[in-house]
Regions:
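N-terminal leader/targeting and assembly helices and adjacent pre-domain segments
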Residues: 1-137, 222-227
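Acidic, glycine-rich two-metal-ion catalytic cores of nucleic acid-processing enzymes
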Residues: 136, 141-227
Length: 227
């Protein structure tokens, strides 16, 4: 589990990097679309290239976040784990997870670009209107939402990797859902706060339970049995 301060730092850093990349990609799209805009040169290869660029941002950031969260869990208990396995699992998860995230992200952006160009002709938009809409699509809010969601996903995965490694050794940890417990907690996550895995939620439910979810998971060893 990450501290609030570390989480905020990781979110800011990732949002800044994503924003820089998306700003450049928005400019590239506008240049290729031309005036008047045409979709002829917006190819699948272009979207794939942009996706690879985003993977280059998300993958190292999420691996780092997962390992930081895993380290925090290990430091909170008197049992160690095979750190090489933790590293391998963090990298494997990041590769699979980020590929899915990027595929969905640029699939949605590709459709949005087609819709914007259609609106340009059907609704009589100006090139300036098109530019503003595209820049909003790639704007700071989008970057922040991606950063918050993916920091949450990576932090939670880091804790789960440690818990699963210990479970393989016969040590079952207690996993609990933890919200930020502030005025921004949503109605989806609020009922799950403090509840252990299996009590109204499964790992499929999250965290993250939704875009911009700021929740985390906490781990502790079960009580020692005494005779």
């Amino acid at each position: 589990m990450l501290s609030d301060r570390k989480r905020a730092q990781l979110e800011r850093e990732l949002a800044k990097t994503i924003s820089s990349l998306e700003g450049r990609q928005a400019g590239q799209l506008l240049k290729i679309l031309g005036d008047p805009p045409k979709l002829d040169d917006i190819t699948l290869e272009l979207w794939e290239t942009m996706g690879k660029e985003m993977l280059g941002v998300l993958t190292p950031a999420t691996i780092n976040t997962s390992l930081l969260a895993a380290e925090n869990v290990v430091n909170s208990i008197p049992i160690g784990v095979n750190w090489d396995m933790v590293n391998q699992r963090a990298a494997s998860w990041a590769s699979t997870h980020n590929s899915r995230v990027v595929r969905e992200m640029y699939g949605n952006t590709s459709q949005a670009a087609r819709d914007m160009v259609a609106d340009f002709y059907e609704q009589g938009l100006s090139v300036g209107d098109l530019r503003r809409r595209l820049q909003q699509r790639f704007g700071p809010m989008h970057s922040e939402m991606v950063a918050v969601t993916e920091v949450t996903a990576a932090a939670v995965e880091g804790g789960r990797i440690v818990a699963d490694e210990l479970a393989a050794e016969g040590v079952t940890m207690i996993e609990s859902w933890v919200t930020q417990r502030d005025e921004r907690v949503c109605p989806i996550c609020y009922p799950r706060d403090g509840k252990v895995l299996g009590d109204g939620w499964t790992r499929i439910d999250g965290p993250p339970a939704h875009i911009r979810c700021r929740c985390d998971t906490a781990y502790k060893l079960p009580p020692m049995e005494t005779e």
